């Protein structure tokens, strides 16, 4: 991390004293630049192309050095459109990697890959900046304790608990509640853990990024009246950006998250939507740089690039970065190298189900498809593990019986199976929960349910103590006491 002094009147552009080169070739977003002998820039140095296009408009394009070609030539990838550039234009070597603003000044704001604000809310305090390229924390700095990251969301905490400093894959199509779940997690980490969140929009639709920003303002995750009280920083490199920007925007978001972890010593939630687009952008850049493609046309450095990003997402003795990554699976092929490489890094998967969303059960997390490496007796304890397994067995049996019930009717199944079905339906409804960020839409106050309360609630349903209560009493409530109170009001 570097502290940049504030600009003064006497300050002449420091870039004038840097190495100067000239563009010799432009192929889309890739530039070849020649520098004077002995003045070659380092790999990952930021270069700036300044000049005017054919109509006299000012050009300011930032590039990143990717290859040293020999004969004093380098190859760089542009972070913005190269329209208007021409051979012979002057290129300035900044002498350092891309650096972005970090700290409290980033909260409530939207940035591009270069750390420039793009929300029309004025400049950002850039006195504290940090380079986007840095090493993963050393082994000695890592926190080796396996601890649960409590989210306050019943279905997640019980069946697919998140690891503090872990990586979670979020699978879900359009309209099943991915955005609302993301916003609730951002809200809960701020309230329960005193933490902040960073959202990295990598290669997704600009409209979705805009919708997320508007919904965050509406649900007060971003506080318009006092921007410093916001709980999230947003970094966007959407699908209309050049591949260089989409490849690096994840690192920009991660750099902002690392400052909150290492300097502010906070728990941070890092969202990456979509991790597949990070790989896709790397594949495009690799082809443009002339590398031989690997399996299915991906870059030969796929595993290294993914590891460089993922290994920086971890818990240290200062704080933690817990990452939730939306994963697009091309053609639903889980063996595709991009998702397969991602899975190797994940600690848990949260799968959203369209069937549950159609039933009105939100969050629509599929209890049988969602998994976690943390769900082991030695980590979560025997009580939690046993309760989770019994819940899964009940739901699995209900799933097996559904076809039979649809054909023959509920009267044709055994008494024991009827009891299983009744309890499974109560469990399914009890997984639903009113969210804080959805209060403005539903009118129901949000509920944060602690892990102990969650376990107690499901144990009571499984024990049969609540068999007499109607199943609608369990729908959209917080803890089990609210369900029993609701049942009293229903009768």
UniProtKB/Swiss-Prot annotation:
UniProt subcellular location: Plastid, Chloroplast thylakoid membrane
Complex and partners: F-type ATPases have 2 components, CF(1) - the catalytic core - and CF(0) - the membrane proton channel. CF(1) has five subunits: alpha(3), beta(3), gamma(1), delta(1), epsilon(1). CF(0) has four main subunits: a(1), b(1), b'(1) and c(9-12).
Gene Ontology terms: biological process: proton motive force-driven mitochondrial ATP synthesis
Keywords: ATP synthesis, ATP-binding, CF(1), Chloroplast, Hydrogen ion transport, Ion transport, Membrane, Nucleotide-binding, Plastid, Thylakoid, Translocase, Transport
Cell cycle as UniProt keyword: no
Residues that coordinate or bind ATP: 172-179
Listed EC numbers: 7.1.2.2
Assigned protein family: Belongs to the ATPase alpha/beta chains family.
Catalyzed chemical reaction(s): ATP + H2O + 4 H(+)(in) = ADP + phosphate + 5 H(+)(out)
Membrane topology: Peripheral membrane protein
NCBIfam families: atpD
Xref: InterPro entries: AAA+_ATPase, ATP-synt_VA_C, ATP_synth_F1_bsu, ATPase_a/bsu_AS, ATPase_alpha/beta_chains, ATPase_F1/V1/A1_a/bsu_N, ATPase_F1/V1/A1_a/bsu_N_sf, ATPase_F1/V1/A1_a/bsu_nucl-bd
GO CC annotations, alphabetized: chloroplast thylakoid membrane; mitochondrion; proton-transporting ATP synthase complex
Residue ranges crossing the lipid bilayer per the database entry: none
GO MF terms held by the record: ATP binding; ATP hydrolysis activity; proton-transporting ATP synthase activity, rotational mechanism
Protein's name according to its UniProt entry: ATP synthase subunit beta, chloroplastic
One Pfam family per UniProt: ATP-synt_VA_C
Role: Produces ATP from ADP in the presence of a proton gradient across the membrane. The catalytic sites are hosted primarily by the beta subunits.
């Amino acid at each position: 991390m570097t502290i940049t002094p504030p600009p003064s009147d006497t300050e002449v552009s420091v870039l004038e004293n840097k190495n100067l080169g000239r563009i010799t070739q432009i192929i889309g977003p890739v530039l070849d630049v020649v520098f004077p002998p002995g003045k070659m820039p380092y790999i990952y140095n930021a270069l700036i192309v300044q000049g005017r296009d054919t109509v006299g408009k000012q050009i300011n394009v930032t590039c990143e050095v990717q290859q040293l070609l020999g004969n004093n030539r380098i190859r760089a990838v542009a972070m913005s459109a190269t329209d208007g550039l021409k051979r012979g234009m002057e290129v300035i070597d900044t002498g350092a990697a891309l650096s972005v603003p970090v700290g409290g000044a980033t909260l409530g704001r939207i940035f591009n890959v270069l750390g420039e604000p793009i929300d029309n809310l004025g400049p950002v305090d850039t006195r504290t900046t940090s380079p986007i390229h840095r090493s993963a924390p050393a082994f000695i700095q890592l926190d080796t304790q396996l601890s649960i990251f409590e989210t306050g969301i019943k279905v997640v905490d019980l069946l697919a608990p998140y690891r503090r400093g872990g990586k979670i894959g979020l699978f879900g199509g359009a309209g099943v509640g991915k955005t609302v779940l993301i916003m609730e997690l951002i809200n809960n980490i701020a309230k329960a853990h005193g933490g902040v969140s960073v959202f990295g929009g990598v290669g997704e639709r600009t409209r979705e990024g805009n919708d997320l920003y508007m919904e965050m303002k509406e649900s007060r995750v971003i506080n318009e009246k006092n921007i410093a009280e916001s709980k999230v920083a947003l970094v966007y490199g959407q699908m209309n950006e050049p591949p260089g920007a989409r490849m690096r925007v994840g690192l920009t978001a991660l750099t902002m998250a690392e400052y909150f972890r290492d300097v502010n010593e906070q728990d941070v939630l890092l969202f990456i939507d979509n991790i597949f687009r990070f790989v896709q952008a790397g594949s495009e850049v690799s082809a443009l740089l002339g590398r031989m493609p690997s399996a299915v046309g991906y870059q030969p450095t796929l595993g290294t690039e993914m590891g460089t990003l993922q290994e920086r997402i971890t818990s240290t003795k200062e704080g933690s970065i817990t990452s939730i990554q939306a994963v697009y699976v091309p053609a639903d092929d889980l063996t595709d190298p991009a998702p397969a490489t991602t899975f190797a890094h994940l600690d848990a998967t949260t799968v959203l189900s369209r069937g549950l969303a159609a039933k009105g059960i939100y969050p629509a997390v599929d209890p049988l498809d969602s998994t976690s490496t943390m769900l082991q007796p030695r980590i979560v304890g025997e009580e939690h593990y046993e309760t989770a397994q019994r819940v899964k067995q009940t739901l699995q049996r209900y799933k097996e019986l559904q076809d039979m019930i649809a054909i023959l009717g509920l009267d044709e199944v055994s008494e024991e199976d009827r009891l299983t079905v009744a309890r499974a339906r109560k469990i399914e409804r009890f997984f639903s929960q009113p969210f804080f960020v959805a209060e403005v839409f539903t009118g129901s106050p949000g509920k944060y349910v602690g892990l102990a309360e969650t376990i107690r609630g499901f144990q009571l349903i499984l024990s049969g103590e609540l068999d007499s209560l109607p199943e609608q009493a369990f729908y959209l409530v917080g803890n089990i006491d609210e369900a029993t109170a609701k049942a009293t009001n229903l009768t």
